[in-house]
Swiss-Prot record:
This is Protein archease. GO terms for molecular function: calcium ion binding. Belongs to the archease family. It comes from the Archaea. The keyword Cell division does not apply. Coiled coil: none annotated. Activates the tRNA-splicing ligase complex by facilitating the enzymatic turnover of catalytic subunit RtcB. Acts by promoting the guanylylation of RtcB, a key intermediate step in tRNA ligation. Can also alter the NTP specificity of RtcB such that ATP, dGTP or ITP is used efficiently. SUPFAM superfamilies: MTH1598-like. Ca(2+) binds at D10, D138, L139. Keywords: Calcium, Metal-binding, tRNA processing. The keyword Electron transport does not apply. It holds the Pfam family Archease.
Amino acid sequence: MFNYFETTADLGVEAKGKSLEEAFKEGAKGLYNIMVDIDKVDKKEKIEFEITGEDLEELLYNFLNELLFYTDVENLVFNDFDVKIEKNDNGYRLKCTAYGEKINKEKHNIKEEVKAVTYHKMEIKQEEDGWKIRYIVDL
């Protein structure tokens, strides 16, 4: 599940999951639903990548910006993600498989361009019923 919250010139995303991995997955869905209707994205292509972060905030920032890199460079949009997060001596490592397809302007109904994810007001916290993340994107 994901929701949006308003900020002054940007857009905030709030995502929840029963696990940290599920919250990151929902956060990525929220990112792509800003850009396109993710229900219209088919799983024709997949990409796999691995990123690290010294803390969870850096991990989330690196994860979402890595996805944006694939959108900017490869013209891909995604609607599903397999996410695995491991804690290690240097912080955290995330492995992701993202599923989607090339952008098709007629099919995907382009809504907004997301320029970047920011650290501004980023939150990641464990709650009684799971995890919640919040982040803001520059449009």
